[in-house]
Structure formats: C-alpha cells, structure tokens
A protein has these predicted regions:
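Short, well-formed alpha-helical segments that are part of the catalytic scaffolds
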Residues: 14-30
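Short beta-strand/loop segment that forms part of the nucleotide-sugar
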Residues: 35-45, 67-69
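Glycine-rich, basic loop-to-helix element that forms the pyrophosphate-binding segment
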Residues: 69-86
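Short aromatic/hydrophobic "clamp" motif used to bind/position activated sugar donors
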Residues: 91
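Conserved donor NDP-sugar-binding/catalytic core segment of glycosyltransferases
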Residues: 99, 103-132
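A recurrent flexible, glycine/aromatic-enriched loop bordering the glycosyltransferase active site
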Residues: 137-154, 170, 205, 221-229
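Catalytic donor/gating beta->alpha subdomain of glycosyltransferases that bind UDP-sugars
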Residues: 166-170, 175-227
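Membrane-embedded multi-pass helical conduit in multi-pass membrane proteins
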Residues: 236-321
Length: 325
C-alpha cells in the first residue's frame, strides 16, 4: 500500500463537543493513515468555550488544527473552510455524529489502489436504540448503506474539479455536491466502502425530527423541473382517473343499474384503490427495498410505522410546495 498524506476535515458546533470528543476517541486504526485533523467548530462565543475546544489538541499525538467561529456557520461553509485550511494531498470528511469503522480509511485506500481511483464516496448506516427510532428509520432512511459525504476520501485536485460545497444552506448541500460529483466523476460511487454507523437519533423527539425533516426537504437541492414534472404527471393521472370514475355511471351507464356498464360505488372504489396502492408501496415495498424487516413488526409497531410515514409524507408535500428555488 502506497503511503498517502491525508487531512481529516470535521465540521461541528460547540453544542456537539461531547460527540466530537467521542468521535476523536474512536478513530482507532484510522489514525495510522492521517497526517492531520482539521476541526472547524462554530458557536464558540466565549473565552471558556475556546479553552474547552483547545483541549482537543491534547487527546491525540497527531496534529489537530482547530478553527473556531463565534457565529454558527452552515455545514457546507464549515467543510469549505476545512478544505482550504488542509495541507495534504488527500482529504477525508467526517461529521460529529456518525462513527467510522475502525478500518474505514484502510479499506477506502485499498479500493482506490485496486481500481486506480481518485476518490470514493462515504456511506452511512442507521442503527436504532429503541422502537420509536426503529419505526422512524424504517420510514425514512432504511437499513441499507446510503451514500453520504461523511466517510468520503478524495484527492484534493479532484475536489477542486468538482467544486466546493454550497456554503449558505442549512441542509441539502451534501446532496447537491453528490449530484454534481456524479456528473463529473461517477466512479466516486463505489460499493464495498465500510459505512459509518449512525447510532440512534441523539435524543430527538418526533416533533424535532419532523422539523428537521421539513427543513431538509424544503432546502433539498433537487432538479425542480424534473421533480415538478413527475408530480404533475402523477397528479394529472390521478385527477383524470377520479373525474372519469365520478362521471362514469352518469355519462356511460346513464345511471341505469341494469346496464352492463354500470359500476356501483365506483368513486369509493377508485379512492380506495389509490389508497391501497399508496399503502402497499409506502408501507411494504419501499421498506423492503431499504432492507427493513417489515414482516417482523408486530401490529402496534406497524401502526406506528404507518402513522410516522403518513405524517412525513405530508411534511414532504408541504416542503415541496414551499421549496426554495
């Protein structure tokens, strides 16, 4: 294995300092491959907080460069600052919460060398700590590894080619960057990367998670033209089908109950049909595709899943209506 000089960039806020300390403690074998750690911490608005974050430098023998800001800065800007301050040829990213596998960097370097790549995108897996978290994760992320910025290892010249992160978004900047990277360097997306583990939802209740879900979806960087067209097509199909159902017995069967074309309760049938399609896809097919063991759920747990899924879908609809262009 060829020696590589790697900078680890971590963005955080002061409120998450205890999680940042836990992350640094659990870098384990990954430290062998790191030349420096760049921590960008915002919300450091007092002298005592400055003292507290500087104690991070004493946790490891490796060079830890701490950059602090009084105001809270967005995740994209935090990463951009870390990139500019980094000194080495390769950059890898972590966030405060997901914890990396102890052989994460070794595994990623192996993939780079075997496939002659300039970078690999990170992956993350969500692990619940209670039944509510299990239902929420099953309704959203699922249990298959999903691509993400944390865990990414990339050559700096490729990063410069792809471009930096959108600095002023509270969320969605990572999705935008991944979409951009897929166009410029699709080989960044590789199977076999050891995923970071996101254990639990850090004590957030359902209301907090709904607010975060709305914030993420309303700021999510998507292709608004294609997404709007898809919504338009589905809406057009459903509306036309319902209008046809409402007028079928009137226009086709002339309300003659003896007619071959008369369909009793056709409106209720069509509404029930679309509801059934939604239910089967959203509550069964989609979770299975995300490696959720849906058939292991008991009745109460399944009802919770249905409730959470419907609420989140309504939030997603509202977020789409209010989508920030």
């Amino acid at each position: 294995m060829i020696k590589k000089e790697i900078s680890l960039v971590i963005g955080s806020i002061y409120e998450d300092l205890k999680y940042l300390k836990e992350l640094i403690k659990k870098l384990n074998n990954n430290l062998t491959f790191l030349s420096e750690i760049v921590c960008v911490i915002s919300g450091v608005d007092s002298f005592q907080k400055s003292i507290n974050i500087n104690k991070l430098k004493d946790m490891l023998d490796i060079d830890i460069n701490i950059i602090s800001y009084e105001k809270i800065i967005m995740p994209g800007e935090s990463r951009n600052i870390g990139i500019r301050k980094s000194k080495y040829e390769y950059i890898c990213f972590l966030d405060t919460y997901p914890l990396p596998d102890e052989d994460w960097i070794f595994n990623s370097i192996t993939i780079l060398e075997e496939k002659n790549l300039k970078g690999v995108l990170g992956q993350v897996e969500y692990k619940p700590t209670n039944e509510f978290e299990d239902c929420f994760i099953s309704s959203t992320y699922g249990y298959r590894p999903i691509y993400c910025v944390p865990g990414t290892l990339i050559k700096k010249n490729l990063l410069n080619e792809i471009g930096y992160f959108v600095p002023n978004r509270r969320s969605g900047e990572d999705v935008e960057w991944m979409n951009r990277s897929k166009l410029i360097y699709p080989n960044l997306f590789q199977d076999g990367v050891l995923p970071c583990k996101y254990s639990g939802l850090k004590g957030k209740n359902f209301i907090d998670l709904c607010k975060k879900w709305y914030s993420y979806k309303v700021s999510e960087t998507i292709n608004p033209i294609f997404y709007s067209q898809r919504i338009l097509y589905y809406s057009f199909l459903i509306i036309c089908t319902l209008l046809l159902a409402l007028s079928w017995n009137d226009k086709i069967a002339n309300w003659d109950q003896n007619s071959f074309f008369y369909v009793p309760h056709i409106s209720k049938f069509m509404v029930s049909f679309f509801a059934l399609i939604y239910f089967i896809y959203r509550m069964i097919i989609l979770p299975i595709k995300k490696k959720v063991k849906i058939f292991d759920f008991n009745l109460i747990k399944f009802i919770k899943l249905v409730y959470i899924s419907i609420i989140l879908d309504l939030i997603k609809l509202i977020a789409f209506i209010n989508h920030k262009k």
